[in-house]
């Protein structure tokens, strides 16, 4: 066997291994970009040496075999994948090939869509009813996931409208948005459950649950992008019009779709999406470009594993391989000690990455990470870079275990890890310089006291020069002291003093949030303020009283009581609010007495879920609260009502499971109109 044949055999072996890891085990070992490079190399070798092409080559089929745990489903129309291009030159070559075949390349209309990073599925509707859902599998045979798909709120169980075919197979992508993914992992860390590396793995793992009740709790959503089988009916003759028809039937379709004439407009769309992808709220890895005319698609036909009339125009890689050179430990405002990996610098999604958070000891154990490992680093949009896997096959003999410190790396205080929690914390409190800095940065942040111009570097200097130890010290600073800071002139110093004075006028909710009570975010702070109305009432509240507040459970109640009972914190709060001293103040909070309100929401714990189209989420919360409702962020047995907007997901499913009444936005608006001031509606 010659050198080329040996390389072809090796590439096939490696690609098959990674196909199995990716498609079957949902545990990819290498980034997509590395897999794509290997596939491109094999394609090139087979193109140069066609005598080496075999029917079982990875270039001749779509993916790997499905798991046997689910019933297998044979696709009546194969689910093919797309060929990829990775730069503008390659895309233009694709466009030219099509233009040459059709003799009208510059005038050709393309339908451009987002390339979603989730799990491809097919949905079979008969007489408008969802009867079967399946994964792609190997393109010919997939897995029957109907029971799980039925739990995804974005997917209609019945199509609505006219001209619905007798049988139609809709194809699309199930994925998870960033917000839902982060909440899922937060809950997993809190309970010691499995933490997912990225939203794609979370979506795939959620659909492969044998128990649909687990899938129902996962924040999955769906966009459709094509059709497979079609019997007993007709669809429009353009891809764009088909998507619009799907939308009319109640199927979710992305609003980031554009018809482009010629390659120049396609490139403009690609660049625009690449620049704005971080604001989408979910992962994409490129743009899919399809010839819009179905007649022209038919003329162009297919190659072995992909259509000639479409291509995936991929973005620069968001995952890359690099080495862990060291691990250091940082201390946050609540004392949480976070391990940070120092990496061999590598370009990921156009940014040089040299650090990645490791979260906690459990995450290090889950990854099996050691210093010196070869790792996969991911950076998506503005998300902090993270290590999502290691390449065990490249682990050197010189690796060293990562050992958590027994004492705080900043102040030397003892560290502790409370049973049932994933986080290790410094016990030094505000004697720890790191905690002091982070607590002060939080106090002046935009969503807290909002001290304009008081940036992180200024706080660092104030603490290091020992000008400031508590939040109260900030308001004692003079312009003269400020001018002693780096890059701080008299005018800037005076502006900061004025900003601190302005920040004294705030709200009780902002003040409570600014204090940095553990696990008390903006929403919980607002609920505490609305429920108790004053600091005095909050200080007097026992655990039972705190548990009456929406979103406050036993753990949060304990954190609030512990913070308010701590003598140092009481001193700081007195200093900050003393009318004869610093005098931070806020308007009186009117506490709503549900018993005095004639409203269907009075005294009810209400949860909002999904997207609202008439009111904003904040407007809805304000209106509901004004009518006596307690607006909570999570569904539990204490929930009295769920208001479900569009694309409601796991909260709606949980409400249905618990038998909690559910109304839609229109019904909420009707009730608000009947029982409140309609001028704001």
UniProtKB/Swiss-Prot annotation:
SUPFAM superfamilies: BRCT domain (SSF52113), DNA ligase/mRNA capping enzyme, catalytic domain (SSF56091), Nucleic acid-binding proteins (SSF50249), RuvA domain 2-like (SSF47781). The lineage of its organism: Bacteria, Pseudomonadati, Pseudomonadota, Gammaproteobacteria, Enterobacterales. It catalyses: NAD(+) + (deoxyribonucleotide)n-3'-hydroxyl + 5'-phospho-(deoxyribonucleotide)m = (deoxyribonucleotide)n+m + AMP + beta-nicotinamide D-nucleotide. Transmembrane segments: none annotated. One of its GO terms (biological process) is DNA repair. It is an enzyme of class 6 (ligase). It holds the Pfam family HHH_2. GO terms for molecular function: DNA binding; DNA ligase (NAD+) activity; metal ion binding. DNA ligase that catalyzes the formation of phosphodiester linkages between 5'-phosphoryl and 3'-hydroxyl groups in double-stranded DNA using NAD as a coenzyme and as the energy source for the reaction. It is essential for DNA replication and repair of damaged DNA. PANTHER family: CHROMOSOME TRANSMISSION FIDELITY FACTOR 18, DNA LIGASE. This is DNA ligase. It comes from Pectobacterium atrosepticum (strain SCRI 1043 / ATCC BAA-672). Belongs to the NAD-dependent DNA ligase family. LigA subfamily. NAD(+) binds at residues 32-36, 81-82, 113, 136, 173, 290, 314.
């Amino acid at each position: 066997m010659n050198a080329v044949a040996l390389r072809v055999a090796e590439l096939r072996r490696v690609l098959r291994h990674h196909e199995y890891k990716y498609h079957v085990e949902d545990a990819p070992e290498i980034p997509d970009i590395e897999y794509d490079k290997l596939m491109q190399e094999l394609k090139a070798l087979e193109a140069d040496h066609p005598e080496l092409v075999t029917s079982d080559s990875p270039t001749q089929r779509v993916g790997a075999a499905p798991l046997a745990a689910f019933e297998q489903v044979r696709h009546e129309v194969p689910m093919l994948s797309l060929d990829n291009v990775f730069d503008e030159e390659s895309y233009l070559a694709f466009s030219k090939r099509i233009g040459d075949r059709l003799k009208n390349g510059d005038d050709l209309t393309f339908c451009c869509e987002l390339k979603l990073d989730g799990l491809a599925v097919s949905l079979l509707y008969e007489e408008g009813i969802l009867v079967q859902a399946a994964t792609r599998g190997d393109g010919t045979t997939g897995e029957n996931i109907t029971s799980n798909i039925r739990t995804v709120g974005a997917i209609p169980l019945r199509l609505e409208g006219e001209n619905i075919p007798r049988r139609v197979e809709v194809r699309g992508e199930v994925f998870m948005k960033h917000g839902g993914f982060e909440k899922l992992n937060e809950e997993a860390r809190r309970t010691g459950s499995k933490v997912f590396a990225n939203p794609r793995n979370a979506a795939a793992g959620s659909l492969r649950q044998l128990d649909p009740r687990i899938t129902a709790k996962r924040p999955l959503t769906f966009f459709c992008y094509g059709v497979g089988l079609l019997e007993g009916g007709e669809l429009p003759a353009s891809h764009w019009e088909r998507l619009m028809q799907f939308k009319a039937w109640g199927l979710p379709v992305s609003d980031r779709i554009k018809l482009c004439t010629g390659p120049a407009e396609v490139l403009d769309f690609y660049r625009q999406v690449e620049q704005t992808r971080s604001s989408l709220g979910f992962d994409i890895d490129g743009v899919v470009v399809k010839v819009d005319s179905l007649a022209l698609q038919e003329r162009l036909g297919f190659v072995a594993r992909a259509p000639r009339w479409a291509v995936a125009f991929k973005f620069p890689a968001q995952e890359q391989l690099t080495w862990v050179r060291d691990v250091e430990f940082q201390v946050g405002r609540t004392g949480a000690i976070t391990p940070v990996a120092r990496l061999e610098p590598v370009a990921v999604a156009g940014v040089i990455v040299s650090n990645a958070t490791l979260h906690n000891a459990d995450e290090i154990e889950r990854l099996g990470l050691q210093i010196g490992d070869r790792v996969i680093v991911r950076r998506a949009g503005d998300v902090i870079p993270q290590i999502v896997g290691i390449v065990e096959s490249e682990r050197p003999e010189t690796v060293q275990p990562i050992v958590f410190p027994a004492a705080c790396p900043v102040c030397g205080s003892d560290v502790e890890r409370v049973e049932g929690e994933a986080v290790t914390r410094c016990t030094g409190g505000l004697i720890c310089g790191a905690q002091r800095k982070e607590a002060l940065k939080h106090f002046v942040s935009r969503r807290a006291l909002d001290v304009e111009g008081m940036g992180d570097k200024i706080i660092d200097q104030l603490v290091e020069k020992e000008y400031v130890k508590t939040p109260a010290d900030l308001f004692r600073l003079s312009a003269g002291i400020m001018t002693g800071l780096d890059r701080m002139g008299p005018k800037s110093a005076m502006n900061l003093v004025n900003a601190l004075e302005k920040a004294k006028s705030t709200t009780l909710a902002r003040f409570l949030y600014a204090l940095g009570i553990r696990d008390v975010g903006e929403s919980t702070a607002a609920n505490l303020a609305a429920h108790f109305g004053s600091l005095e009432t909050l200080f007097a509240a026992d655990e039972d009283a705190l548990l009456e507040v929406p979103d406050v459970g036993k753990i949060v109640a304990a954190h609030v009581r512990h913070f308010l009972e701590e003598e140092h914190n009481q001193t700081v709060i007195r200093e900050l609010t003393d009318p004869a001293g610093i005098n931070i103040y806020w308007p009186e909070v009117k506490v709503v007495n549900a018993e005095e309100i004639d409203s269907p929401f009075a005294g009810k714990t209400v949860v909002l879920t999904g997207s609202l189209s008439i009111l904003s989420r904040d407007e809805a919360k304000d209106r509901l609260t004004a009518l006596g409702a307690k607006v909570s962020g999570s569904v539990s047995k204490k929930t009295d009502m769920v208001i479900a907007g569009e694309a409601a997901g796991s909260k709606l499913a949980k409400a249905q499971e618990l038998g909690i009444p559910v109304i839609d936005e229109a019904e909420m608006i009707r009730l608000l109109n009947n029982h409140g001031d309609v001028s704001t509606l």
